Amino acid sequence: MKILFCSSEAFPFSKTGGLADMAYFLPKSINVLGHEIVVITPYYEGIKKHHETMTYLGTKTIYMGHGEVVVNYYKLVYESITYIFVQNMHYFEREGLYGYHDDAERFAAFSYAILESLDIIEFYPDILHINDWQTSMIPYLLDKHYRHQSFNYFRIHTLLTIHNLQYQGDFDKDVAKFFNTDFDYTYIHFDRVNYLKAGIERATKINTVSPTYSKEVMTREYGFSLDGSLQNRINDFSGILNGIDDQNTFNPKTDKYLIKTYSVSNHKSGKNLNKQFLLEHFGLDKNLDEPLIAYVGRLADQKGLGLMEYCLEEVIQYSNAKFILMGSGDKAYEDYFRYLTYKYPNKVGNYIGFNEKIAHIIYGASDIFMMPSRFEPCGLGQMIAMKYGSLPIVRETGGLKDSVIPYNKYTQEGTGFSFKNYDSYDLKEKLFEAINLYNEDKKTWQILVKQAMKSDFGLNQMARAYEELYKNIIGEKI
C-alpha cells in the first residue's frame, strides 16, 4: 500500500503535541510492515536549520479564493522515511505553528498544496491519511476539484484521524471563499465554517486515538457539538489506541536520561537511585521509603488540574507523600503550584516548563503518576509511567480507561488506580488508597509495579491496527 501521511506537525521538525509524535512513530512502524509511506508537512521557521540536507523538488501555483499562492516542495529522508515540506514564507515561516488570525487561509493553502503535490513528489497514494482540522478540508477539495482530473486522483481514499475533537477549525463564513466552490453545507456548522466537520462528512473512514474516546465523542458530553455528525458515520468510525516507543525512547533498560537504568527484575534499586537524584535536585526530604507522586503534562483544565488543586494540599498535609510537577500552561495553575512549593518546600517541587532529561527521571523516580483528566483522547503519560514502574491514578475516560487496569484488592490484578466521576473527592480517595498500599503492603505494591512494567503499548501493535484499517479502506468503493 501507498500512504501519504498529512500532518500539520511532525517530530523532530515541528511539535506542539502528540500529533507530531504520531507523525514520526506511525510512519516508521508502517514502513517496517512493508508499506510505502511519505509524510507531508509545512516548512515552518524552525525547519530552516535542516535546509542544507533537503532536495528541492519543484514549485506549484495554487489558485485559491481571489488570489494565487506559490508553494515550493522540498524532500528530506530521515531515518528511512521520506518527508515532504511545503514552503510558503508568508504562511508558514513564523515563530509558532498555530494561533494566527489567518489560520483558516494558511491550512486551506496547505490542503491544496498536498493535493497539488502528487506529480511533483512522484507519489500517487492509495490513501491520504489526514489528521485533525488542519487537513480536514482535503476530502472535500479532493471530491470537488481533483477526482475528475485523472485516475490517480479518482482512486484515492481518505482516512481522518481525530486526535482531539475539541479543536475543530471553526471560522467565520467568509473563509468559504478559499474553497473555490459554491456555498456548501458540508462544511457549515452553526452558521460557521468548520473544517473538521467537512472531514467527518467526506472522509472514507474516520478514527480516533482510543476505543473508549470513539464512543465518548458520539455523546453530547464529549462531542463538542459534532456528536451528531459522528453518529451519522458510526459504521465508518473506530478507535485505535496510540502506542509508545517502548523499545528505544521509553525503555528504562536503555534510557540515556536516567541516572540508573533498570528492568523489571531490578526496578526497586534502579528507581531508588533515580528518586535519590530527583529529591536532591528539587531540594526535598531525602527519605526514599516515602511515596513520590508526579505529574508531567500541560497545566490545563482538561488534564484535571482543577481536581488536583482542590485535593492535593490535603494529601500533602495528611500523608508522607511528596509531589513533583513538570509542565506549563494556564498561569493560574502555574502560580498555584509555585505557591505549594513555597508553602511545602520539603515536600513539593515544580518545574514550570519542560526538560526532556528531567521528565524521564521523573518517570523513573516516581511511585505514583497522576492523570485525572476531564477527558483524554488517548494519553501517553500513563503508558510511559507504567513502563517505568510508576503506577498511574487516572479517571476512567478515553485512552486512560483503555490502557490502565484498575487495582483489585481481592485478586491483586491491576496496573494502576482509577476513579469514574470527575470529582476531587474521588481523586483524593484514590490518592490515599495508593499511598496507604505503598506504605503498608510492599509485597502487593511490587506485584502491581511488575504488572505495569510488563504492559504492552508498543508501536507494532498500533501499526498493525492501522494496517488493518488501511486494508479495509482500500476495499471500499469510491
From Swiss-Prot:
Could you say which residues bind ADP-alpha-D-glucose here? 15
Q: Which domain of life is it from?
A: Bacteria
Q: Keyword annotations for this protein?
A: Glycogen biosynthesis, Glycosyltransferase, Transferase
Q: Which GO terms describe its molecular function?
A: alpha-1,4-glucan glucosyltransferase (ADP-glucose donor) activity; alpha-1,4-glucan glucosyltransferase (UDP-glucose donor) activity
Catalytic activity of the protein: [(1->4)-alpha-D-glucosyl](n) + ADP-alpha-D-glucose = [(1->4)-alpha-D-glucosyl](n+1) + ADP + H(+)
Metabolic or biological pathway, per its Swiss-Prot or TrEMBL entry: Glycan biosynthesis; glycogen biosynthesis
Record has Glycosyltransferase as a keyword: yes
- Example GO biological process term? glycogen biosynthetic process
Cross-referenced Gene3D superfamilies: Glycogen Phosphorylase B
Q: Report if keyword Disulfide bond is assigned.
A: no
Q: What does this protein do?
A: Synthesizes alpha-1,4-glucan chains using ADP-glucose.
Which NCBIfam families does the entry link to?
glgA
Query: Cross-referenced PANTHER family, in alphabetical order?
Result: ALPHA AMYLASE DOMAIN-CONTAINING PROTEIN, GRANULE-BOUND STARCH SYNTHASE 1, CHLOROPLASTIC/AMYLOPLASTIC
Please state which protein family the record places this protein in: Belongs to the glycosyltransferase 1 family. Bacterial/plant glycogen synthase subfamily.
**Protein name according to UniProt:** Glycogen synthase
Origin species:
Acholeplasma laidlawii (strain PG-8A)
Supply the source organism's classification. Bacteria, Bacillati, Mycoplasmatota, Mollicutes, Acholeplasmatales
Q: Which gene encodes it?
A: glgA
